[in-house]
Regions:
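Positively charged n-region of N-terminal signal peptides that target proteins for export
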Residues: 1-5
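Bacterial N-terminal signal peptides
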Residues: 7-16
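Functionally critical loop-and-helix segments that line ligand-binding/catalytic clefts
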Residues: 22-32, 163-225
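Structural detector of well-ordered beta-strand residues that form the stable sheet scaffold
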Residues: 80-82, 112, 147-149, 169, ...
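Beta-rich nucleic-acid/ligand-interaction surfaces
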Residues: 153-163
């Protein structure tokens, strides 16, 4: 059997059964952990969209983003960029770090904010206020509503239900459906594996489902694409 077909089958077999038989559109998210990526092969393996890490906190940039970002577009993938949020770093400084690396074009997906770790001690009230500020700053800068990425146990222990205006990207593995996350009635994107195998990526990679078609996903993107 041709190698490309084998890899495409491996990707399909690693996905959970569709939740309630809904339409799900496959994507991946990457960072420097994945090393060099052959995005043309990723696209050929049946991946429709992808996110690449751009920045972390108020100073760190991902060293692979400058290569990944144009290559994703050249390969024909619907692309997005994400920021690894650092609790305790000033929201305005985190915005400056992300915008230094990311210029969005029409058709690009909205920024995703990865909220999964409490790096510095901070009271719950201040932590919630800072995240609201950062998300509002992102929305004002790019003109699209950012996506919140998190995992149920961390979010439910540290945040409240006041973020439901933002689409939810939930991470939970080895289950038929992710647990509820405080504030949301359902998820928009589900990261269902952190150990996927995809042609063009030489290391395990995060696999994601968007709940809907690719055209539905593009409705979240920067207008004009």
């Amino acid at each position: 059997m041709p190698k490309l077909l084998l890899c495409a089958l491996a990707l399909c077999l690693s996905l959970p059964i569709a939740v309630n038989a809904e339409t799900l559109t496959s994507g991946v998210d990457v960072s420097h952990d994945q090393g060099p990526v052959d995005w043309a092969k990723v696209k050929g393996a049946g991946v429709d969209w992808a996110y690449a890490k751009a920045s972390e906190g108020d100073t760190v940039g991902d060293q692979t983003f400058a290569t990944n970002w144009p290559a994703m577009k050249s390969a024909g993938l619907t692309r997005g960029a994400y920021h690894f949020y650092v609790v305790g770093d000033p929201p305005k400084d985190q915005l400056a770090n992300f915008t230094k690396h990311v210029t969005l074009e029409p058709g690009d997906l909205p920024p995703m904010v990865d909220v999964e770790r409490k790096q510095h001690p901070q009271g719950r009230t201040a932590m919630i206020a800072d995240l609201h500020e950062f998300l509002s700053l992102l929305k004002a800068h790019y003109g699209v509503t950012p996506i919140v990425y998190t995992e149920p146990a961390f979010w439910n222990a540290n945040f409240d239900g006041s973020f439901s205006d933002y689409p939810l990207w939930v991470a939970e593995y080895g289950v038929r459906a992710p647990r509820p996350v405080t504030g949301w009635t359902g998820w928009t994107i589900w990261q269902h594996s952190e150990s996927g195998k995809v042609l063009g990526i030489n290391t395990p990679v995060d696999l994601d489902h968007f709940k809907g078609t690719l055209q539905d996903l593009k409705k979240l993107a920067v207008p004009g694409g």
